[in-house]
Each structure stands twice: as structure tokens, then as C-alpha cells.
Design a protein with these regions (language model features):
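An N-terminal assembly and electron-transfer interface module characteristic of large anaerobic redox
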Residues: 119, 123-130, 433-441, 448, ...
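Gly/Thr-rich phosphate-binding beta-strand-loop-beta motif of the actin/hexokinase/Hsp70
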Residues: 1-20, 94-111, 300-332, 403-420, ...
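Conserved phosphate-binding/catalytic loops in two-lobed NTP-binding clefts
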Residues: 76-80, 226-245, 383-390, 539-558, ...
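Glycine-rich phosphate-binding/hydrolytic loop that grips phosphoryl groups
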Residues: 127-132, 237-271, 394, 438-443, ...
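Glycine-rich phosphate-binding loop plus the immediately following alpha-helix
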Residues: 34-35, 112-153, 240-243, 249-253, ...
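Short glycine-rich, Thr/Ser-proximal phosphate-binding strand/loop in the N-terminal lobe
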Residues: 4-44, 115-116, 120, 313-345, ...
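Phosphate/ATP-binding catalytic cores across multiple sugar-kinase/actin-like superfamilies
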Residues: 182-206, 247, 290-299, 496-519, ...
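Glycine-rich phosphate-binding loops at beta-strand->alpha-helix junctions
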Residues: 64, 199-228, 239-243, 369-372, ...
């Protein structure tokens, strides 16, 4: 008899085979990290079923099996090998295997050229990811499949990890998106992650097997893979057991089953993990800590004692917080609970309950803040809206007038506010990753079977907190599970996670030069700081005592109530907040639709309320609301796009069509190459600028998921050109850019410079004999060398092109480029002058040339101009700064063309009080790790605020809107909170 055990990251599978390979017994269960106990239970069940079985050939496989085999002296079979053996034995002729496990994902390419691709320590796009998303949608995991079957639309969602996806899904939930559509979107995200992250450009075709729990139990997930791959995969019988059966097929050594329990118990008793000092040495130390933090408090009252009040609502990423405040600042009533994916229901229930219980207490005015601000304000007629950073500032300043630093850690957001002379001096916000936030702890608490409150209390008694570093949630999943296998208690894991949250906040977001740089009067707030472990860890790490208000979790709502009171005092009026009768007639319906008014094809969520009031979300311009085209007269991004669209086309080409992929440096050099190629007798056809399907066209050929999104798009651009039947494609490698004088050198970044090589290596059609892909190395620094290189390049396919033709074409190209450059600067100056005449703030939306691509920037430019600001790009102002003088002040080597413009733009903004810089940074851009710090330094040393927005393929602008509004509010530009 042969026995195989597959101990995965979340489940354990056993397969018992007879000598002929027939399956006699099998089981599939979750182990909740209690691996030794689960094996013992399976052993007992096996002995009951086969009472005469004393020994068998036994082997163990799976990511959780190595520790067991090492400690018990058993045979270990690598899971890829086990799966390969089983697939080849049971399903001959299989070309590829796709398996999704709890935290593991793999693709096996079988046949002559065997290859295995596995995820590393990131568990994005696996079963654990789907579990997290189900929890976020407040449904059981099996219900995800039922929901997806009823979907009508799909949204773009990241599946890199659970917390990134929360950042995408939560705003959609708060805007009223249907759970059915979100479930389908999650499955598509998982399929996309597996294909781009694992296949890395290798085509998946032929006979494909789907294995593992998620693909077995969820037909819609299989459909998503079929759709993306354009195949029809097969989920075979016993698909959950392939690794276990493969291990059984490979079992070589006979094992005495009667002594196995003793070995397992001995192994389970071992403890070996890295740990930190305890948060509290004894109970007395904790008592002193609690007493100190009970001093800072808001006075508490009841609605029964007040005839008038103000209400603040904080519709956060994962929770709803409500504060009712008396005119003298007492907290009369409060509400704090998970929004369970539907903030509208939570607010309606609270208001109905409040009006019913306290009919004598009149609400004078209300304000709402947070992710769900727009939805709640429209639905319930809330008087005012306020960006959450300002709401938290007002609350902290009310409690501690001398506050100079505020740290707020919420469900998914981290806000750090530097205060100087009673006003916000600087703002730090976490990026799209929310690993150091409350949802991070909540996720682990739920995985381990506790509420967040229970988990926090347990951590207080930890004697050896596990040292987990400061990594993201799914990266840390593996560390936590390993610590459990090494004997760490839940208390030590809870304390260790609390410490890791603090380290993430300090060293990934705030990054202070010293503890003195943070301040002396520090207020910490947000629901996460209600956890005494997190608060203690912060104080220990910084060696500082801080202030935690008694309403730390309600500060956003309390600040909103204070703001409502301030606005009401300035202009008393009858509140527009729905009354009890109106709440009784309250109706809320949600419908998804696609906007067809432009090429963006935005997925709109239309919320309809009683009386026909509508709130539309998901739009990236005002056209679905106003039915008028956006006005872009003060938007240089759109004007640059228009200049590119208006480039002349050679309609009488003597040499046919030349295709250009419209991405990366082509957004700057298209005028140059268009003039050159047109002069040589080609009609230039570039791939579309605003086609949202471009990414999907090339998705299967992307070799690395870590490269920036603009580079990933290039695969789709090439595919589009090939689909049009274009046989000439021009996309040269370019180490150097045009020399703008003054910088140490004029390099392109490695991705911009050499990505044509990547495309040639991964898109097989480019190697067809009928396709001419011109990707030679060219430089624009020396005209003579350029002429020579162009002649050599074109000689392969067009030997009739003469040197004289090329020389004239190069001259025409430089003329066209410098003309385009002059037009950009002139238009930029016109926008600046007009903005100053109209007293509008000016935003320099600084990035790289390709950031004007609407697919890349997701119309952030229009979001800014819709708020009432004028917008120019970095190249419109960078020439105003003398680069050689700037170089002396820089702390980095200024040798990259794009970087030089960013530094010059930051310097220019620092010198002009009516200008504000927002830097666009693409995820995965290593170069911008340098530029971001240097631009921040250049601005902050002159007392200016630096704002950064990270962008990739996710087009929900909720977080970006908060950053932009925070900048405008902190700079006191205008009352952006009431727009």
C-alpha cells in the first residue's frame, strides 16, 4: 500500500493507493496551521479504516511538509515533481497544468521542454486571496462563484495581493458597485495574475489541466482562465489530490505507522523562532500605561441632555464611524462598526434609530468624510463634505492645541500630518498598499479565529513577540505560518504583528531622520491605535510618550462634526440632512453601466435615491453628468495629446506603411519619428492612444509582472499593429535621449532604452520572416552617426533608401521635434498666464512623457482640473531653471533626461507660491525611487508640500482624489471640501 500526504499552505490532503494505483481512501481538509494535530487525526482515521495496516510506503509533499519530514525522518517529494508524475500517469498528452492552492500557484509546462513556474513569497492571486476578498464582500468563499455567475460587468482589480485589491474593491463598494460584478472581477484578476506573473510570456495552449481547490470548486474561475487564454481547460476527477497521489506514486520507503504519532508529538513540542522583547514586562507596567492614556479625553454626554447637535460621519474604507456632538464639544452619541460592503444601509439604520430615540435633539448640520463621502453626501443630503486629512486635523487640534504631529492609522489608510504654527505643514499618506493598517491585523485575527479586539488583548500577554519585520500581508502570511510551525503562540504572533505595523508606518511611510524630527506633541488616532499593543509598540520604537484620545477610532467623524459646526456658525441655515419621514421613504438602487461618450468606456455605477436623485461614480470626467465634453483649455496634458493627434500624415506613401507602438518615449519622440519616416516615403500608423483593450491584447507575452505598467502596455501596442496586418514596425532601442544641456548626461531609463529587445524576445510573431521589426540601437546626439545607423538599419528591408534621403529626413525630424517642443512650452506659458489672471492654483503634474497617456494616468489630469486648478507638465516649466546651478544643489547625479526635468520642475515650483507639484510615479519604477526623494527634498526644504500619486493598471481614483484634495486643503487654496 502507498500513502501520499500533501501538506499545503492552508489544507492537507491524503491519498491511499493500492499496489495497482487505485485510490482506496482520500481526504481534503483545512489545517489552520495545526499541522501535527491534523496529521495525528488523519492517522487515527486511517487506522480505524484499515485496522490491520501497520506499515506502508509513505511520502510527504507540499509547502508545509518539509518541517514534518525533517523532524520525523520521512521521505519528501517536491510538489512540482509529484504533480508532474501524477498528471503524466493519469492524463497522458497534457500540455500544461495550472494549479492554484491556498497560498501557492504554479504552472507546469509538460512535454519535451518541461518547465515549472511557481509564485514566490507573494500569495496574490491564490486561494488565500479569494478568501480575503470574500471576507471583504461579507460573503462565504463558496458564494463567490454564485455571485460571479450573475455578473454583468467586470472592473480592473489588482490581484498582486489582498491589500492592494482591497484598495481597489473598497472604493467600488463604497460607490455602490454590485457584489456580483466584483466577484467576477476578482476571478478575472486571479486569472490575469497567474498568466502574467507565472507564465511570464510563455504561451499556454493545447490540453490544459486545472488543479487545486479554487479551480476545482469555482467554475467561474475556470471560465475566467478559459476566457483570458482562449482555451477550454479540463478539471479532472480527484483534481484536489494530484500532489498527494503523485507523492504516493513516488513513495520508496516503508514506514512503521505505529510509531508515527510519537514522532509527530515530539516534533510539535519544539520551539525555534526569532523573537523580540515583550511589550510589557509585567501587569504593573501595563496598569501605568493605561492610566497615562486615560487622561486625554473628549467629554462624554448623552443626546438626552442636549436640544441641538452636530453630526459627523466618517465613511471609511472598511468601517462606518458616526459622532454626534453638542455645541460645546461633548460627544453625545457614537457609532462604529464594519460597513460590511454597504455603507448606505449602516448610515440609514443609524439615523433612523437616532431620530426615533431622541426626537427632541435637533441636528443643526452634518458633514461627511472618508472613502464613501460622495455616496453618503448625495444619498442622505449631508450638508458638507470634508477631505479626511483635514477632518482628523481639526479633531486632533481641538484636543491638543499644540499638536505638531498626527499619525492616523485606519482600516486601509495611514495619514501622517506635520503641523507648524497651527496649520498643516506636510502630509504623508501610505501608497496603494495598506499593509501597515487595521485591515492587516484584522485579516490575521480572522484567519486565526479571533475578533480584532480579542486578538489585541491576547497580544498584551506575549512573552516572546515574533520578529516579523515590516512586510506586506501576504508576504507575511508565510512568516506567520512558519512561526506557528515553530511553536509560536497566538499571543506572540499578535504582538509581533502589532510591532510590524508600527515598523511599516515608521520606516515605509514616515521615514523620520530622527525621533526629534517627528515632534513633541504627537497625537495618534484611528481605530488601529485602540489596540494597546500597537500603541505600546509605537512608543517603544520611537522612545516617546504620545497622546491617544479616548475616541481614537472616531476622530475622523468627530472632526467632521467640528467642521459642520464651524461652517454652520459662519452661515446658519436649515439642514439638508434627511429627516425621519424622508428616511422612511428612502430608496436606494444600484445599476452598473458602461459610458459610451468617449473611448475610455468607463464602468459607471449609478446610484438612484428617492425622488430620482442620482449619484454616478466610476466616471473620470464630468461628461456622464453634464453631457458636455470636458473643457481642456487649462490642461496641458490634453493639449499635448491633441498636438500628437494632429501630426501630418503622408497620404501618398511610396514605401507603404510603417507602424509605431504608441507608448513610453514615443509620447515625446513621435513628432521626430513621424517627420523622419514620412520624409522617407512611409505612411506612419501608430497604435491607438485611448483604447482600453490594448493591455489585454499583449497580456500573455509579458515576461515579468514587476515591470512598470507603461512597459507592459507596449506588448499590446505591438500586438495591435500586427493584428492590422502591418509588416513594418519601427521601435528603436535608445540608450540616450536628446541632450537638453546642463545635465551630467542624457540617459534614458533602462526600460525605455531597451524594451524593444524584450518585445522581440517575447512576441513570437515579430520573428516571422514577413515582419520587419526595426529595433536597432539609435542615438540622437550626433546627426552624422544617426544618418549612418539609419542607413544600415533600413538597408535590410529598403536598400533603395539613399544616404541623402536620410540626411534630409533627419533634418526634417529635428525641425519637427523642436517645433513641437516650442509649442508645448508656449501652450504651457499660456495656461500659466491665464490661471494667474483668473487666480486659479497651478498644478505641475510631473512625470515622464508617457504619463500623458490616458491609459496610464487614468485621467488624473481631468480630476485635478475639475477641482478648479490649471495643469501643466514638467517640461513646460523645467527650462526656466538653469540646470548647472541646480546641479550644485542636488544630492544625486543628474544624468537622466527625464529626471533632470523633474528636479528643475520641483525647483521652479518651490520658487513660485501659486504652483504645486504632484508627481506621478508608476509602480515598479526603480528610477523614481530616487527622483521622488529628491523632488520631496527640493520642495520641503523651502516649506512646500510634496505630493506623490502611484499609478498602475488600476483605474479607481479614490485614493488619488484624497491626496489631491489634501494638498489643496493644506495649502488653503480654496474651499475644496465643499466642491
Amino acid at each position: 500500500m502507498q500513502i501520499g500526504l500533501d501538506i499545503g499552505s492552508t489544507t492537507i490532503k491524503i491519498a491511499v493507493l493500492d499496489d495497482a494505483g487505485n485510490l482506496l481512501f482520500h481526504k481534503y481538509e483545512r489545517h489552520y496551521s495545526q499541522i501535527a494535530e491534523k496529521i495525528l487525526a488523519l492517522h487515527k482515521e486511517l487506522m480505524t479504516k484499515f485496522p490491520t495496516l501497520h506499515s506502508a510506503h509513505l511520502a510527504i509533499s507540499g509547502s508545509g511538509g518539509i518541517g514534518v519530514t525533517d523532524s520525523c525522518g520521512l521521505q519528501f517529494v517536491q510538489e512540482v515533481f509529484a504533480e508532474k508524475i501524477c498528471a503524466e500517469k493519469l492524463n497522458p498528452g497534457t500540455d500544461a497544468v495550472i494549479e492554484l492552492g491556498g497560498e501557492d500557484a504554479k504552472i507546469l509546462f509538460l512535454g519535451r521542454h518541461f518547465d515549472a513556474r511557481m509564485n514566490d513569497s507573494c500569495a496574490g492571486g491564490t486561494g488565500a486571496f479569494i478568501d480575503q476578498m470574500a471576507s471583504l464582500l461579507n460573503v462565504e468563499t463558496p458564494q463567490m462563484n454564485e455571485l460571479a455567475q450573475q455578473a454583468h460587468n467586470t472592473y480592473t482589480i489588482a490581484s498582486r495581493c489582498g491589500v492592494f485589491a482591497k484598495s481597489d474593491i473598497q472604493p467600488l463598494l463604497n460607490q455602490g458597485a454590485e457584489k456580483t460584478d466584483l466577484a467576477a472581477s476578482i476571478f478575472h484578476a486571479v486569472a490575469s495574475q497567474a498568466i502574467t506573473g507565472l507564465a511570464k510570456g510563455r504561451p499556454i495552449s493545447g490540453n490544459v489541466l486545472y488543479l487545486g481547490g479554487p479551480l476545482t470548486f469555482m467554475s467561474c474561475l475556470r471560465d475566467a482562465f478559459d476566457s483570458v487564454l482562449n482555451i477550454k481547460g479540463v478539471c479532472p476527477e480527484n483534481s484536489l489530490l494530484y500532489v498527494a497521489m503523485g507523492a504516493a506514486f513516488c513513495a520508496e520507503h516503508e514506514v512503521d505507522l505505529t510509531t508515527l504519532p510519537e514522532k509527530l508529538q515530539a516534533a510539535a513540542a519544539q520551539h525555534s523562532f526569532e523573537h523580540l522583547p515583550p511589550l510589557f514586562k509585567n501587569e504593573g507596567e501595563y496598569t501605568v500605561f493605561k492610566k497615562r492614556h486615560s487622561k486625554e479625553s473628549v467629554a462624554i454626554g448623552t443626546p438626552a441632555e442636549a436640544s441641538e447637535a452636530f453630526i459627523g460621519i466618517d465613511s471609511g474604507s472598511t468601517t462606518i464611524k458616526i459622532a454626534v456632538m453638542s455645541p460645546d464639544g461633548k460627544l453625545l452619541d457614537s457609532f462604529y462598526q464594519s460597513n460590511k460592503g454597504n455603507p448606505v444601509v449602516a448610515v440609514r439604520n443609524y439615523l433612523t434609530d437616532f431620530y426615533t430615540k431622541y426626537p427632541h435633539c435637533r441636528l443643526l448640520a452634518g458633514a461627511v468624510t472618508g472613502y464613501g463621502e460622495d455616496l453618503i453626501r448625495h444619498g442622505f443630503g449631508v450638508d458638507y463634505g470634508i477631505v479626511e486629512t483635514m477632518a482628523h486635523f481639526y479633531a486632533a487640534q481641538y484636543l491638543e492645541p499644540e499638536v505638531d504631529f498626527i499619525l492616523d492609522i485606519g482600516g486601509q489608510d495611514m495619514k501622517c500630518l506635520k503641523i507648524h504654527n497651527g496649520a498643516i505643514d506636510n502630509i504623508f499618506l501610505n501608497e496603494a498598499c495598506s499593509s501597515g493598517c487595521g485591515s492587516f491585523l484584522q485579516t490575521f485575527a480572522e484567519i486565526l479565529g479571533y475578533t480584532a479586539e480579542q486578538f489585541a488583548q491576547i497580544g498584551l500577554k506575549a512573552d516572546m513577540p515574533v520578529d516579523l519585520g515590516s512586510r506586506c500581508t501576504v508576504f507575511m502570511n508565510s512568516s506567520v505560518k512558519q512561526a506557528q510551525k515553530d511553536g509560536a503562540s497566538v499571543a506572540n504572533i499578535s504582538a509581533g504583528l502589532s510591532i510590524s505595523i508600527v515598523k511599516n508606518a515608521l520606516y515605509k511611510v514616515i521615514r523620520p531622520a530622527s525621533k526629534e524630527a517627528i515632534g513633541k506633541h504627537i497625537v495618534v488616532q484611528g481605530g488601529t491605535f485602540l489596540n494597546d499593543c500597537v500603541l505600546r509598540a509605537f512608543e517603544q520604537e520611537m522612545d516617546l510618550n504620545v497622546i491617544r484620545p479616548n475616541i481614537a477610532g472616531l476622530m475622523g467623524a468627530y472632526g467632521a462634526a467640528l467642521y459642520a459646526q464651524r461652517r454652520y456658525k459662519d452661515a446658519p441655515h436649515q439642514t439638508t440632512l434627511l429627516n425621519l419621514q424622508q428616511l422612511g421613504e428612502f430608496v436606494h438602487t444600484v445599476k452598473g453601466m458602461t459610458c459610451g461618450l468617449c473611448n475610455n468606456h468607463c464602468h459607471l455605477t449609478v446610484n438612484t435615491f428617492a425622488g430620482g436623485k442620482r449619484f454616478i461614480s466610476g466616471n473620470r470626467c464630468e461628461r456622464p453628468i453634464t453631457h458636455m465634453a470636458p473643457k481642456d483649455e487649462l490642461n496641458l496634458y490634453r493639449q499635448k495629446l491633441q498636438l500628437l493627434k494632429e501630426l501630418p500624415v503622408n497620404e501618398t506613401p511610396k514605401r507603404g506603411i510603417m507602424g509605431i507602438p504608441m507608448g513610453l518615449n514615443m509620447y515625446e519622440l513621435l513628432p521626430f519619428w513621424n517627420a523622419l519616416l514620412s520624409s522617407l516615403g512611409f505612411k506612419v500608423v501608430h497604435s491607438p492612444i485611448e483604447d482600453k483593450n490594448i493591455y489585454r491584447l499583449g497580456q500573455g507575452t509579458i515576461p515579468s509582472d514587476t515591470v512598470c505598467y507603461p512597459a507592459k502596455l507596449m506588448h499590446g501596442h505591438i500586438k495591435w499593429l500586427l493584428q492590422q496586418g502591418i509588416t513594418n514596425i519601427f521601435y528603436p532601442c535608445m540608450t540616450y535621449n536628446i541632450d537638453e544641456q546642463g545635465t551630467e548626461n542624457c540617459y534614458n531609463c533602462p526600460v525605455v532604452a531597451y524594451y524593444p529587445e524584450v518585445l522581440h524576445a517575447n512576441i513570437r510573431d515579430l520573428n516571422k520572416p514577413e515582419i520587419h521589426f526595426f529595433y536597432d540601437y539609435l542615438g540622437l546626439l550626433h546627426k552624422k552617426k544617426l544618418v549612418k545607423k539609419l542607413q544600415e538599419m533600413f538597408a535590410k528591408a529598403y536598400p533603395d533608401i539613399t544616404k541623402d534621403e536620410i540626411r534630409k529626413a533627419v533634418d526634417a525630424a529635428f525641425t519637427a521635434f523642436y517645433d513641437y517642443e516650442a509649442q508645448v512650452k508656449a501652450k504651457g506659458q499660456q495656461i500659466i498666464s491665464k490661471a494667474r489672471e483668473e487666480h486659479k492654483p497651478i498644478v505641475v503634474l510631473a512625470g515622464r512623457p508617457y504619463h500623458i497617456d490616458p491609459k496610464v494616468n487614468h485621467s488624473i489630469d481631468r480630476l485635478i482640473t475639475n477641482m478648479g486648478a490649471a495643469l501643466v507638465s514638467e517640461d513646460a516649466v523645467s527650462s526656466h531653471i538653469k540646470t548647472k546651478e541646480l546641479n550644485r544643489d542636488l544630492q544625486v547625479l543628474n544624468q537622466w533626461t527625464y529626471h533632470g526635468r523633474l528636479y528643475a520642475a520641483a525647483e521652479y515650483v518651490a520658487q513660485n507660491p501659486d504652483m504645486h507639484l504632484i508627481q506621478l510615479v508608476s509602480f515598479g519604477c526603480g528610477c523614481d525611487a530616487i527622483t521622488a526623494d529628491e523632488c520631496r527634498r527640493l520642495l520641503e526644504e523651502r516649506g512646500r508640500i510634496y505630493t506623490q500619486i502611484k499609478i498602475d493598471d488600476i483605474d479607481n481614483l479614490g485614493a488619488a482624489k484624497i491626496r489631491i484634495r489634501s494638498l489643496f486643503s493644506a495649502a488653503q487654496l480654496f474651499d475644496i471640501d465643499n466642491n
